[in-house]
Amino acid sequence: DLTAPCISSSQVIRTAKLLTVIAEHLGKSEDVKAYSEDIKRISNGLQKYAWDDEAGYYSYVIHDETGEAKEQLRSESGENMNKTMDGIYPLIAGITTDEQTGRILSHLKSEDEMMSKVGISAVNMKAGYYATNGYWNGNVWFSHQWFVWKTMLDIGEADFAYKIAKVALDSWKREVEYSYYTFEMLSITTGRGGWFHNFGGLSAPVNIWASAYFKAGTFNLGFDSFCENYSFENDFTHFSADVSHYNGKDSIMLVVMNDKNNYVVTVDGEKAVFNERSKGTFEIKLPSDKKRVKIEIQLV
């Protein structure tokens, strides 16, 4: 097939970024160089050939017989054929400009386009090729939403991250209470699950989200932040962590404490910027200008 999606290249970039951090910690400078070159080369290809400024999505790219990029995949009417979850994946790779990020977020957040009542649609609901009876098309896949959720922590979109998790938890709860099945996906039209009835890809992200916001002793970061070490008190009334932060953005760290108490939050000993999403659940801003920070949460 001569048509390339965005998700494969984007996941290679994201994986290479993770490996770069590990290689840096291990002192593997040659590996860091190799990964960095791959990231740059693939990122340049996506930006040069795949971005469609009119649509605000990255495109499927058709290649010629020699493997050279030829054109973006479009319908007979000229509509971009990748107004889909695939078309937003370079955001997850962390390679989008601020303008591209804004365009993609506008699609993801729009209840007319991708943010359905049961989660993020795999296909833009306003696209000419959106269908309600497909397998990928017309449905919500939690595994891909997990990647979007992590990315929202990376770029400081705490409110939207919570909305993704909360809508997914509520949708999953309704289906499981009715059928006691964990289907592959949820239908946007009916809100019901479909296809294989014991699918771990649906239930695993749900467990992560439930813990991320409601289970004391849990913390989460985006893809571009890494916890060097951490400690919780046994009763979850004190937390400390050393965090490395690589993307130069105001990212978010989620920490869930014992919800029976009040706390003070500091970053490098200074009062932190944070939001208490619910009692004991903290969304802490990691300053964009610091690569390494000390996070501490303690009783007032």
Located regions from the model:
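Active-site acid/base region of carbohydrate-active enzymes
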Residues: 1-6, 37-41, 47-59, 103-124, ...
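Inter-helical turn/loop segments and adjacent helix faces that build the functional surface
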Residues: 19-36, 152-155
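C-terminal capping/lid segments that line or modulate ligand- or cofactor-binding pockets
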Residues: 57-63, 68-107, 134-236, 245
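Generic long, charged, amphipathic alpha-helical segments
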Residues: 116-141
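Surface-exposed beta-strand/loop patches in extracellular or lumenal glycoproteins
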Residues: 244-261
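Short strand-turn-strand beta-turns centered on an Asx-Gly dipeptide
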Residues: 266-270
